[in-house]
């Protein structure tokens, strides 16, 4: 198994996969991130820019599974394109000379532009890229290129919701610091997924004896919830005032997610991936996941 972009999710995946018997190789542009994965020996840690070809000769085939968990390299939309488009293209060039059986790419639910709170499935991505946010357009192009690239005999895209878990506490840290105003629209739905449930989903996909034709699947928990509901529940548990939301405070990163001046607001359905793999999130809603974090 090769894990590209081995950061927050990748480190957890590497730990579980290594214990499960996989020979794991890990890649990141951040040496400190790789050093934290003690179960992977130094000779199997590759520090490099993914979009560069400089790392290609460090990894030889055959490879049972290549998983790209890369996140944006920063620098706005240009960083998005560098990470998600050029990074995947670099992996494809590398795979042309190696026997790579399976490729998994983690995209995001930002490819869904709906703003009306409706429930969406994998079929609800608009045909016209101009209907997507700038970030969504880049991710959708990356998805399309991967699904069409036959250099990988089997390929799959997982669209992840907002990631949280140990050390990554959406809203929780803000409330603990005493912040009482949060950027955004409180009535908009959040589609979350716990880090450990992502790891379980990736391994569930790899356990399938045969993959279906190339396709995208949503990996989110079972119960999308309004932002204000999540924040209020956390505030109650912490014993602090319930914060209010202010859309005018949205930063540049949030503005790149807007569609037609509005923030995304939809409830993402995970039924297709559950039916395919039998995966069930251990944390089916935000309460389950955050209760564990609060108790920890």
Positions of PLM-derived features:
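Conserved Rossmann-fold cofactor-binding substructure of NAD(P)-dependent oxidoreductases
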Residues: 43-64
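NAD(P)-cofactor binding segment of oxidoreductase domains
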Residues: 61-105
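Conserved Rossmann-fold NAD(P)-dependent oxidoreductase catalytic core, especially the SDR/UDP-sugar
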Residues: 90-132
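Catalytic helix-loop patch of NAD(P)-dependent Rossmann-fold dehydrogenases
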Residues: 116-157
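Glycine/proline-rich active-site loop of Rossmann-fold NAD(P)-dependent oxidoreductases
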Residues: 137-140, 151-152, 164-173, 183, ...
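A conserved pocket-lining segment of Rossmann-fold NAD(P)-dependent short-chain dehydrogenase/reductase
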Residues: 173-193, 197
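Mid/C-terminal beta-alpha module of Rossmann-like enzyme folds, strongest
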Residues: 201, 208-258
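C-terminal amphipathic/interface module of NAD(P)-dependent oxidoreductases
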Residues: 260-296
